[in-house]
Each structure stands twice: as structure tokens, then as C-alpha cells.
């Protein structure tokens, strides 16, 4: 990628993240991103069709490597990895998760349903097999989202291994 294009995209992305933390997604306008990134409107739209497209790229960046190539990992290792990734990207994750952004939550929930639920169900929910699967999926996914939300709001940080233990104990 051309360095000028990469620099422009970084400026737009950084402005988006700053505004996400300052204003929240719902109160942010494309014009706010343009002003903070110090780019022209046509430049913004040359790279992104909308603020939704920018959010989509952010979600892709956050989730892409999380669940790819981890099929063989055990549940605890996978969860610790995810929590570490969320801590590393706390500025992005916290803003989106705590704002309850619908797109972000849908993307996160889809990834969790596909990649986390089967492992958790296999290892920790054997005694709950007589319950409807869609209820179990909903329970695991919402418990995960709420656990991460709680964790991101804590003043005294809990390490990822301890958080993994808390999450698994909630499910057992």
C-alpha cells in the first residue's frame, strides 16, 4: 500500500478511535472524523463509504486473528488469549462494548457462537445437555459479554487467567 494512503487511513482510523472514546459511536458524525483527521470529505469517502464501514474495518481488525487458527486450542488457552487481546485493545473494545453498539455486539456474538460456544459446551456444560441449545448459546454468549464488560470497568484489574477461571466457574 502506498505510504500516503496508509498515513491517511491511519489518521482517519485514529480520529475514529479518539471520537469513539470521547463521544461514543452513536454521537459521532463523519464530519467529526474528517475534522479531527484533518482530511477532506472526498478523501474520507475514497477510503470508507460511511462511518459504518469504518466500524466494520475496526471489528475485522479486532476479531480477525482472534479466532483464526485456534481450533486446536483448549478452552482456557483460547479464553486467556481473547482476554489478553481485549486488554491490549482496551480503548477500542471498551468504547464499543460499553456503548452497547449493536453492530459490534452482533459481530462479537457471531464469533463467540461459532468459535467459543462449541468448546465451552463440550468441556463445561455436559450436565446441561437437556436444555435447549439456543438457550445455552445465549447464556454463554451473554455471560461472556457481561464478564468482559465487568472486567473493563474494574479499577483493580483482574489478570486474564483469573478472569478465565471466573467465566468458567460462572458456567459450571
Where are these regions (language model features)?
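Basic, helix-initiating cap at the start of DNA-binding domains
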Residues: 1-23, 27, 32
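Append "Primarily bacterial transcriptional regulators
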Residues: 12, 31-36, 44, 86
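Amphipathic alpha-helical linker/stalk segments
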Residues: 18, 28, 58-82, 93-95
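Amphipathic alpha-helical segments enriched in hydrophobic/aromatic and basic residues
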Residues: 20, 29-30, 44, 51-59
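Short hydrophobic/aromatic patch on the recognition helix
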Residues: 38-47, 144
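Amphipathic alpha-helical packing segments from all-alpha helical-bundle domains
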Residues: 101-146
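C-terminal peripheral helix-coil segments that are non-catalytic and often amphipathic
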Residues: 150-172
Amino acid at each position: 500500500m502506498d505510504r500516503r494512503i496508509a498515513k491517511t487511513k491511519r489518521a482517519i482510523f485514529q480520529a475514529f478511535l479518539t471520537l469513539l472514546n470521547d463521544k461514543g459511536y452513536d454521537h459521532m458524525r463523519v464530519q467529526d472524523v474528517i475534522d479531527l483527521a484533518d482530511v477532506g470529505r472526498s478523501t474520507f469517502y475514497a477510503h470508507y463509504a460511511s462511518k459504518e464501514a469504518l466500524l466494520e474495518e475496526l471489528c475485522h481488525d479486532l476479531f480477525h486473528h482472534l479466532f483464526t487458527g485456534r481450533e486446536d486450542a483448549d478452552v482456557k488457552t483460547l479464553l486467556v488469549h481473547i482476554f489478553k487481546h481485549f486488554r491490549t485493545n482496551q480503548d477500542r473494545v471498551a468504547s464499543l462494548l460499553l456503548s452497547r453498539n449493536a453492530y459490534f455486539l452482533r459481530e462479537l456474538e457471531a464469533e463467540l457462537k461459532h468459535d467459543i460456544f462449541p468448546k465451552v459446551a463440550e468441556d463445561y456444560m455436559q450436565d446441561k445437555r437437556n436444555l435447549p441449545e439456543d438457550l445455552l448459546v445465549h447464556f454463554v454468549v451473554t455471560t461472556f459479554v457481561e464478564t468482559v464488560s465487568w472486567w473493563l470497568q474494574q479499577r483493580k484489574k483482574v489478570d486474564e487467567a483469573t478472569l478465565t477461571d471466573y467465566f468458567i466457574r460462572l458456567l459450571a
